[in-house]
Amino acid sequence: MRGIIIVYLFLILCNLFHEFPSRLGNLHSIPVSEEWYLIVVNRWNEIPEDHRVELTELSNGQKVDSRIYPYLQEMFDAARKDGIYPVVREGYRTYEEQQKILDDKIKAYINEGYSQSRAERTAKEWVALPGTSEHQLGIAVDINADKSKSSNDEVYTWLAANAHNYSFILRYPQGKQEITGTSYEPWHYRYVGVDAAREIYERGICLEEYFEQ
C-alpha cells in the first residue's frame, strides 16, 4: 500500500512539473490585443511594427501618449489632495534612448569589475531590450516623489492602493518575475483602462495573467 501511495505522489509531482512550464509558455505567447491600451510588451512580445503614438509633453519635459494624459493628470491631482506629490521620472522613450540606457547599464557593471558577458546578462535583468520596453509605447510611466514634499515610499504606497481607480496598474508586482520577465518595480505604472485595471488589482494578478482567463 505504501508503495502505491509513493508512486501516486510521484505521478502527481511529474504532472505539476509538466504543467508549470506549459502555463508559462502560454503566458509568454500572448496574442496582440486589438485595444491599444492592452498591448502586452515584454521580453517575449515585441512592440508591434505598426505601433504609432501621438505624444503630450509634461511640465518637466517627459512625454506620454496623449490618450492617457487626462487619466494621469486626474490620478496626480487626487494624490495631491491626499498630501502625496508624485512626479513622472520617465515617460516615453525612443528606440535609441532605450538602447542608450541599456548600453550605459552594461558599462556601469563593467566599471564595477563585471566581465562583458556577466555585465550584459545582469543589465538585461533590469533594463529591457529596445523594442521590448513599455516606455516605447508611451503608456507606461516611472513615478517617483517630489522629494521636497513626499518620500518615494509614500508615493509608492498611495499608488499601490489607488492607481487602479484611474486606469493604471503596477506593471511589475512582487512574485511575478517569472511571468513578466522583469523584477519588482514599485515605480512603474501602466495604463490599461479602468475595467482591466480594477480586475487586475482585485485579483492580484499581472497583465500577462489577465490574458490567461
What residue ranges belong to the model's regions?
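Extracytoplasmic cell-surface/polysaccharide-interacting catalytic and binding patches
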Residues: 8-213
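N-terminal Sec-pathway targeting helices
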Residues: 1-9
